Amino acid sequence: MKKDIIIIGGGIVGSTAAFYLSRESKHHITLIDMGIGTASRAAAGIICPWLSQRRNQDWYRLTAQGAAFYLQMMEDLTEAGTQKLPYQQKGSLIFKKKKNLLEKLYQLGLDRRESAEMIGELSIYDAQYLNQLIPNLVTDHGAVLAKGGGRLDGAALLDLLQEGFLQNGGTLLHGRAQLGAKQTVLLEDQTLAYDQIILACGAWLPDILEPLGYQVDIRPQKGQLLEVQTAFETENWPGLILPGEIDILPFEGGKLVIGASHENDKGFDLAIDPEVIGDMKKSASQFLPDLADLPISKTRVGTRAYTSDFLPFYGNLKDRQSIWVASGLGSSGLTSGPFIGWQMARVILGLTNPFDRSPFSPDQYIKK
């Protein structure tokens, strides 16, 4: 029987779920995108979770599977007619100042490669070699190179997923939605009925659920980044994961994306802060001094969602089985988000999902 499935949230989770639901079924799928502050649309990401030193093994298992899922998703997008993919494996360089920290990181990569071949070749490079590898780089740090690390343009991926969704017969609406009575959604002057609904609205999840009497363990975090157009030959540069919060993502044609900030006290503020942008550019210029004299070509800002224990959650509400939720992905949303969206689509359609999602149950984060 044909069902009505609604997705609220056009970010990475919602757009992926919409793409796969419309690809794998004949149900009527509606995606509602508010279009304001979407973290993944504002983001460009390095996809390389294997060398993260976060200790939580559930988080690592999810993000490692998320990174591996990119290979399948790129195949599916190619099959859908995509000519230029937004994800490329050009490697990732993780910088450390002390030799013992580099060796520790390298060993971590070797250990994890036994169950994650996608890491690829691992190497330790000293500062002298790095300065030769990237001629514009100036550093006294060493780095570990993971050849399997990827880079991603978040906005380009969202556009492709939503284009594929529309080609599959999906309906895309814009606006701020609310849950109504008896399995309905209120969107401006429309009332839409659903059989199943996915709430993939990131930091805005409390706004939707709290009027129904739920308490949601989610807080917003502001993230800003900047772009600089250079004359560097960046096409085959690896992503640079610098000490602190700053990454440098190289794209074709000399474009460098720098960021992102992690601002916990700004709520849903989406104003560009010149001081924060300037500080990030200054930090990046310590490694690429030529950046100091180049103008900023573009800035972006979005709102991430975090839980109190920094783990994401996804699944359906125990007292309302027709309502599915996903939030709390934080700064690893581009890595884990597509895999989460794909899983929820499969479970809703009654297809197999071998991944154990029980550690990410919404029950401990959403109370009534």
Task: List the predicted regions and their residue ranges.
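A conserved short coil-to-beta-strand element within the FAD-binding core of flavoproteins
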Residues: 150, 171-185
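Short beta-strand to alpha-helix junction loop
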Residues: 61-65, 95-102, 144-160, 271-276, ...
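Beta1/beta-strand and adjacent pyrophosphate-binding region of the FAD-binding site
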Residues: 1-11
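Dinucleotide-binding Rossmann-like beta1-alpha1 core, especially the glycine-rich loop
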Residues: 46-133, 283
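C-terminal catalytic lobe of FAD-dependent flavoproteins
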Residues: 290, 294-368
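Core beta-strand elements of the Rossmann-like FAD/NAD(P) dinucleotide-binding domain
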Residues: 2-3, 188-196
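Active-site substrate-recognition segment that forms the wall
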Residues: 6, 16-23, 34, 45-46, ...
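Helix-loop-beta segment of a Rossmann-like dinucleotide-binding subdomain
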Residues: 83-94, 111, 118-168, 261-266, ...
